[in-house]
Amino acid sequence: MKSINNIISQALRQCQPLPDDVEKLTKIAIETRGLVSRYISPKVVEVIFGGSFAKGTWLKEEVDIDIFIKIDNSVNDKEFGQLGEQIGWQSLKGFNPYIRYSDHPYVEAVIDGIRVNVVPCYDVPKGKWKSAADRSPFHTDYMRTNLDDEKRNQVRLLKKFLKSIGVYGADIATGGFSGYVAEIMILKYGSFESVLHAMSNIGEENNVISIDKPDEYSVKNFKSQLIIIDPIDHKRNLGTAISAESIGKLVLAARSFLAKPSIDFFIKKEQKLVGNNMELYPNLVIAEFNYKKRSPDIIRGQLKRSLIAISKQLELANFKVVRSTCVTDEEETAAFGFLLESVTLSEYTQKIGPNIFMREETANFILKNQKKSLITWVDSEMRVSTLIRRKTTNAKHFLKLLLTKKIESTGITRGLVGDIQRLFRLYSGDDHKINGIAKEAVKELISSDQRIF
């Protein structure tokens, strides 16, 4: 087995940009900033670089160029958004630009294979934030000041590791660790390996990551498994955006890597279906549909929120959801997938009512269930019980009903309702025609990361 130092050196060669990469990226960045500067208005104070390019923490062959337009803080919110879009569209018009969404819309284009973002922010003093992007220039300055070349490479290793195990990105769909969080963790612990040691030993609570001494009042009021204090805004907890699943996966991946170092932890693994997984096919239900093209940020957020809503409806109908997922090709097709304990239920179910000494509640329970009850009795704990016939016993049929006649009341994001109503395809696990995006959902539901488990 190779030593951990050998593995880390090998991984660094995979993620550290070559001089030619730096030269190409810098050329595109400077030229694009020049285009943006042509179209600025008197209300624009400055045009600056931000993100991983500006901080020098970008990964080889995986980089965006973020250009921030600092707008005078006297501009109102509506004009702020309009100005940002206008400058972005005009400056990138030769590269088929499109709108992306965060707190405010911003404009993106791909130039010579490099994704370029033109993002508006207010020119404000530290702590006087008016938009979510206002902190970004301060983040950039902080990291450029505090990260040396060695730590920048350690950030690259951590980012590559997080990407490989699928927990990189603070968007709602991923619920993972942002690039900025990775930078903070390296500053806090000093190296990639030290971050893994720290994460592999976290406790059930009081997990605070703060470069400076944390404000006790703020920490007490933060509610998340990991509390990560933003060093330029101590009242902001970056850990709020990180899901329990992502934290858990990083903890287990860290333990596995430290126990048995492997370059595989820096390579994105395609999930494969193997023989043992196939026996779970009968427990799957997949809903696939086409949608009108929109920003990947929007569709992923809509899918995640809708997945939670549909899962809740399945649980309310007594279908135990073991695992769920949503996938998209980010072009036109998406799918919801559910692994259930069983796709069928017994025809009858017992409803247990109140204790007979709860006079009014007992009377109400009997009255409410009188017409649909097959039998009613008093059980050994002196509770009224009744046996009723289920409205549905098949998860596929239930999901079909949910996505047609009851779709308006399911909690599915309104932006997806029309897309689903136009046409959707339902598969159960024993269907042999599952392919495309639906197949990707199946892979996510019934496969395990062999590096960790």
Question: Where do the model's predicted regions map?
Answer:
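N-terminal regions immediately upstream of nucleotidyltransferase
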Residues: 1-60, 77-78, 106-108, 121-123
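Argonaute/PIWI-family RNA-guided endonuclease scaffold
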Residues: 8-27, 31, 35-38, 42, ...
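Conserved catalytic core of two-metal-ion nucleotidyltransferases
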Residues: 36, 82-129, 314, 322-334
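Catalytic metal-binding acidic patch
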Residues: 50-88, 117-129, 332-346
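Internal, well-ordered alpha/beta segment that forms a basic, Gly-enriched binding/recognition surface
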Residues: 110-166, 170, 182, 190, ...
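Conserved nucleotidyltransferase catalytic core and NTase-mimicking acidic/glycine-rich helix/loop elements
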Residues: 150, 155-331, 338-351
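Extended, charged low-complexity segments
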Residues: 329-453
